[in-house]
Amino acid sequence: MIKVAIAFGILVSAAVLMKKKDMSYRQSILKSIYPMIMWSTNSNGKKQLLENKNGATPSMSFYDLTMNAIDASPFNFSNLKGKKILIVNTASDCGYTGQYEALEKLQQQYKDQLVVIGFPANDFKGQEKGDNQNIAAFCKKNYGVSFPLMEKSIVIKNNQQNLVHKWLSDPSQNGWCNQEPVWNFCKYLINEQGVLVNYFPMTIDPLDPLVIAAIEKK
């Protein structure tokens, strides 16, 4: 425990010294301690994995859904037919915000077969207070995000939940899954035919072998 505390102190100090102009001190510290957060929570995350083991198919097509991208332009999900899609609810001030870096690496590694899509949301402890313009700038400057981002919306179950997360968490639409996001950076994988196949909690890193195996599965 003493070694962990010392390491934590070093990381925090380094984060303060190396703070970027476009990052708050909180954001800089969270980015620095992200590896420690993942180390401490990863084992629990594997208990929360969900998989479409029975091959359930949706009664409502995912490709019929539309939303606005973060720049307010219409985004048509039908254009993604034939590729896997990883949907992630995101936030800029979360302990898991460091996953942006891994998500971008994942997108680049599998760009011919996968599209990562971020859904900024302020649903958990007010950790995404910025507007769409600020969120887009933060992601680009600090993590080099090139994958699509949707406009800021609500991802948890209520009457304002965005249509995509309504589909992801309603078994009457997707065929089997009723799991809403429990925190920022929960991940849903949709296959090339528009079938929801996996749910990964925030405690599973985007580059975890479990995620990679699901993406590479034929």
List each model region and its residues.
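Typically the conserved alpha-helix immediately C-terminal to a functionally engaged Cys/Sec
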Residues: 95-109, 130-133
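Short, internal strand/loop/helix patches
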Residues: 133-183
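Short active-site neighborhood of thiol/selenol oxidoreductases, capturing the structured segment around
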Residues: 75-98, 103, 116-120
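N-terminal targeting signals for export/organelle localization
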Residues: 1-62
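Loop/turn elements at helix/coil->beta-strand transitions in domains of secreted/extracellular proteins
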Residues: 81-85, 111-115, 143-148, 192-195
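Thiol-/selenol-based redox modules, centered on thioredoxin-like
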Residues: 163-166, 170-218
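Thiol-based oxidoreductase modules, predominantly thioredoxin-like and allied folds used
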Residues: 89, 113-130, 145-158
